[in-house]
């Protein structure tokens, strides 16, 4: 594995509950832009990161694996001085945050997967594998993936914009290498049985990372798991239903028992 990297990131809020958010395969950290204006920034502080090969880390060398991504996330938490934190991961980022849990379970307060890739990977039939593998060099493949995973209901302008962002803010070689890791690696034995509270949020219009798949994986592996299906949403909840996503995720994070301690500590006088 290559040396850890301090991931490019932006901080939002100054709340006592620290949260690290990791993007998915088809976007950099700007994937979270639609939700940023309406987050509870008094209760939480969010670090939104770019993984290697994306955004400001587009030219960063690496193995482009979920394990390396997890090591990078932990290095960032160390740099920020965050001993305990919650994690949010979208799609591929859901696999990365589960890797963080596997590597440092004592540091994770709560785990959120937004249409998360299971820790068992996502085996694809040959024709789908060809579509996904070819997406590195063929923008039209990315468009088909975006359209299919949002139920074929999103406007052409949005699909075109998402493809442009994906191509402009990712390195093609890194993009292709990430696929082998998140789709092909199975590490679920390292997180199975973890007592961490774990929320999976899925969209009813997403045929790939569906509620059915999460019931067979996430809900079986995490004893303290919750599953929420957003009815008018596909794979990209941050774009499709941002306010619903914020409410579901922040209600879940706010239920953490340590939040009471955080509030008391913040209000304590020297």
Describe every region a protein language model picked out.
Residues 98, 102-103, 108-138:
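Flexible "cap/lid" loop of the alpha/beta hydrolase fold
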Residues 68-84:
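Conserved acidic catalytic loop of the alpha/beta-hydrolase fold
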